[in-house]
Amino acid sequence: MAKQVKRKRRPQIKINTFCRFTAAGITRIDYKDVDTLLKNINESGKITPSRMTGTSAKFQRQLTTAIKRARFLALIPYTDKHKK
């Protein structure tokens, strides 16, 4: 009978441990605030997950909706190939 190989889990890396929006006292994230939205998108254009940024679930949902609206209105690019 063959031996079972134990796989090692990759350690999770958490960069921030606090929500930036809660600390700043922000109540809503607006799609027109392009600078804030661009800080939460990586270089390939993907939305950065909350486990990397430390954003709370409430603000992560608002952030995702705002980024999608801003993309639709062409305020921010969908991918890195669409430069302004």
From Swiss-Prot:
The entry's cellular-component GO terms read: cytosolic small ribosomal subunit
Show which residues constitute the signal peptide: none
Keywords per UniProt: Ribonucleoprotein, Ribosomal protein, RNA-binding, rRNA-binding
Q: Which domain of life is it from?
A: Bacteria
Write down the Pfam families for this protein, in alphabetical order.
Ribosomal_S18
| Keyword NAD (UniProt) | no
Q: Is Repeat one of the keywords UniProt gives this record? A: no
A single GO BP annotation from the record?
translation
**GO molecular function terms listed in the Swiss-Prot or TrEMBL record:** small ribosomal subunit rRNA binding; structural constituent of ribosome
Its quaternary organisation is:
Part of the 30S ribosomal subunit. Forms a tight heterodimer with protein bS6.
Family, per entry: Belongs to the bacterial ribosomal protein bS18 family.
**Summary of the function given for this chain in its UniProt record:** Binds as a heterodimer with protein bS6 to the central domain of the 16S rRNA, where it helps stabilize the platform of the 30S subunit.
Q: What is this protein called?
A: Small ribosomal subunit protein bS18
Source organism per entry reads Ruthia magnifica subsp. Calyptogena magnifica
Write the lineage as a comma-separated list. Answer: Bacteria, Pseudomonadati, Pseudomonadota, Gammaproteobacteria, Candidatus Pseudothioglobaceae
